[in-house]
């Protein structure tokens, strides 16, 4: 076998390996993303558990004052007396890198919540929309949490459209767990933000993602209203870090099963085509040897 033939065969083998890599990328990258999310959740829990009561209470009070200022600003806006308080919870509350984390049992979501909605934030978790209430709940508050949908490397809010009225999601903020029950699902244009404002007397949290899937011309708003939290209903036991890690493992397995038809079709086409190329090269080599 001459050098040229060896190079062609080597190239064909490399292409086959590349095809396998392309086909397996979504699953592997999602496993890595899930692992990072699990680590962030564990770090947050450890940070909160290490905080003394005085510091924790001070952080909660700062968050509530911030939310009250947002409510007061809403009243001034309604009266035509808008004023910028210049206050940011970032300057007042320090509980680590993330603000907390969200769990959505129905769609196996367990993600850290970060300040802001930059691309860097939304690639690793859920972002808290600036100008919305700090996600600690309370009367006349409305926190808005945003997440990407349809990324190849992470699931994030991809399955948010499966939530229906009556489903629940949970916010783990400091040492509290806030339960929200979905009471409204809407699709709006990006500039339509009326459904994200504070409603006097209500305690809302709205989850936002792009829709339709992979087109992203509109926004899906899944709003939850605060309901009493029963410590058993979220995971069937007291929430612990080890349980979240188990949930992450279950999520990855579920994703592999759900995505397997697409993975197998894509992988089969790529690998099959490259295997055919390899066979053609081998046939050509054999024919050349016979001719010689």
Where are these regions (language model features)?
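Alpha-helical transmembrane segments
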Residues: 21, 270-286
């Amino acid at each position: 076998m001459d050098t040229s033939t060896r190079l062609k065969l080597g190239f064909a083998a490399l292409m086959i390996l590349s095809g396998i890599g392309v086909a397996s990328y979504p699953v592997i990258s999602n496993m890595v993303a899930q692992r990072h999310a699990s680590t962030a959740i564990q770090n947050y829990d450890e940070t909160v558990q290490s905080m003394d009561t005085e510091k924790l209470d001070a952080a909660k009070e700062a968050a509530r004052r911030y939310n009250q200022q947002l409510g007061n600003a809403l009243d001034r806006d309604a009266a035509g007396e808008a004023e910028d308080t210049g206050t940011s919870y970032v300057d007042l509350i320090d509980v680590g890198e993330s603000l907390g984390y969200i769990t959505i049992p129905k769609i196996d979501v367990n993600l850290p919540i970060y300040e802001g909605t930059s691309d860097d934030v939304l690639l690793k978790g859920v972002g808290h929309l600036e100008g919305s209430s700090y996600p600690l709940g309370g009367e006349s508050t409305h926190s808005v949490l945003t997440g990407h949908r349809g990324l190849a490397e992470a699931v994030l809010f991809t399955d948010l459209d499966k939530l229906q009225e009556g489903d629940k999601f949970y916010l783990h903020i400091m040492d509290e767990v806030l339960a929200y029950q979905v009471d409204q699902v809407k699709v709006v244009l990006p500039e339509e933000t009326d459904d994200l404002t504070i409603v006097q007397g209500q305690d809302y949290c709205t989850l936002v993602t792009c829709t339709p899937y992979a087109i992203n011309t509109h926004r899906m708003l899944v709003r939850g209203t605060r309901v009493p939290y029963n410590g058993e209903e979220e995971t069937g036991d007291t929430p612990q870090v080890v349980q979240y890690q188990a949930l992450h493992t279950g999520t990855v397995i579920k994703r592999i099963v759900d995505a397997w038809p697409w993975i197998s079709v894509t992988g089969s086409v790529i690998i099959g085509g490259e295997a055919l190329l390899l066979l053609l090269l081998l046939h050509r080599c054999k024919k050349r040897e016979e001719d010689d």
